[in-house]
Amino acid sequence: MKTYIGVDLGGTNVRVAKVDEEGNILQIVKEPTEVAQGTEHVINKIISMIEKIDGYADCEGIGMGVPGPVNTIEGKMVLATNLPGFEGFPIAKTISDHFHMPTFVDNDVNVAGMGEAMLGAGKGLPVVYYVTISTGIGGALVVNQRVVAGKNGHAGEVANIIIDRNREKVNYLNVGAVENEASGTAITRKGKAIFGDDKIRHAGDVFDLAREGNEKALKLCDEVAYDLAVMFSAIAHVVDPYVFVVGGGVMKGKDVFFDKMEAYYRTMIHKGMQTVEFKEAQLEEPGIVGAAMLPRSYVDKENI
């Protein structure tokens, strides 16, 4: 069975794993990123970690997931807020030159979407749209087991989709951007405005109040459900995926908003699109497994 190396590079920790073509993690190592010590230090750390993997030289390729937009053609980060010094650095080429092995880099949402499309909730389907609803909102379009990157590598990103112009200006995103209205951060912000900072620490506190029957919390969850439905309907009318795969920390509160969201969504799309399904993400380690699937997607032509 073929095996691949997956690298999950974050601002705090870096993980490297050997993964087989069925998505099983055969070996994994984890170390602090130590980004303050510089780009070269982090790259050398990744190289050292890969070399700790048994049989790494027999793997088919290396895939890396990183936090931020990526030029997937050049294998470079376009913006590296959590990894200072990595912006424009030739990550893929540096790793590939060292190991003489095909190496690919993409952002962490795209690799998670890749993992779900190939091995998780979207397995076997030709067009999968992955959405993660967490601190922010991200998306990835996977067609025939490849992430659609677009001209600038930003295809599939949904955070800035406008769901209602009649909202407040929150940050650099558009007024009414779905991330500012329905992400975990947005739910927390709105919950604090309603209930106070002392009662709301995170979105989970809002969900708990809704479960207790608190009318204001239920109303907020209903509004979030509607806003997400607007986003999903906009995506559906452009992409018409076979399935929406939804992951992220906010899904821990799915019992108080997700069915409502899907019901609203069904009223926003025409009859011919009602067969599009919603599924919850299935992979326990979508980041590192999805990263390992990048070389499988690009190198193993029989899998495409």
What are these regions (language model features)?
Residues 29-31, 81, 151:
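Short hydrophobic alpha-helix segments
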Residues 67:
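Conserved NAD(P)H cofactor-binding loop of Rossmann-fold oxidoreductase domains
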Residues 77-86:
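A charged helix-plus-loop insertion that forms the helical arch/lid used to bind
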Residues 109-110, 114:
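Glycine/small-residue-rich loop that forms an oxyanion/phosphate-binding "nest" at active or ligand-binding sites
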Residues 123-178:
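Glycine-rich phosphate-binding loop of actin/hexokinase-like ATP-binding domains
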